[in-house]
Amino acid sequence: YFSNSGVSILYKIPIYQRNYAWGREEIYALIKDVHDSLEKSVYYIGTLVTYKRDENIFEVIDGQQRLTTIYIILKALGIETIANCLTYSARKVSAMTIEKMPKFGEEKDKGIVDGFNYAKEAIKDIVGEKKADIDAFKDFFLNKVHIIHYRVPKDVDLNHYFEVMNSRGEQLEKHEIVKAKLSEQLIGDEDAMEKFSRIWEACSDMSFYIQQKLPEMTTVFGKTMEDFVIESFDEFPSSN
């Protein structure tokens, strides 16, 4: 899915999905499970559910944590032929972190950076440091590890489908469902989606006043920072 084969395919993780959240335990477990399966002819790593938004653009509906982890592991293995075909909708820092990996800038998604470091540690601890062992693991991961890709039909009601997916496994919190329903109304409008994402992220961080989280604070809250000077969502400034 990530090989640089000349086919320009992009997997986009939509705004309603959680940030990347796999920790040391999950990443170690996955790498160990794959390593324990080296003698098998194939290893199925899970299921990916997507919705085709454009000719070669797939919106990830389910499986984004696992898909992102696969990408992180490939980068941690130092495989240079991996195409940059995974990104985040309306999350510039996360998208930039994925794109620049393993060379992270000052602005970075901590969850993704931590995941990369955990993957590096796990590879060293489980696979070892011998070139032959690492090469064997790389070859298996690239050629024998498979993910089942299910593409949702075009006529499917995504709101309903998302609710069904959420009824199994680890359920979303109520505020995450609200976020999904609101963002669904903005699909197709990248500028509006980006605005919504920044507003939501600023409001969801309860450790700061919202004025401290928005660079456009004087435009939105006035010079005293105590007013609300815009009258509609359309007036909220774009980041561009």
Q: Can you annotate each of these PLM segments?
A:
Residues 1-240:
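Covalent nucleotidyltransferase
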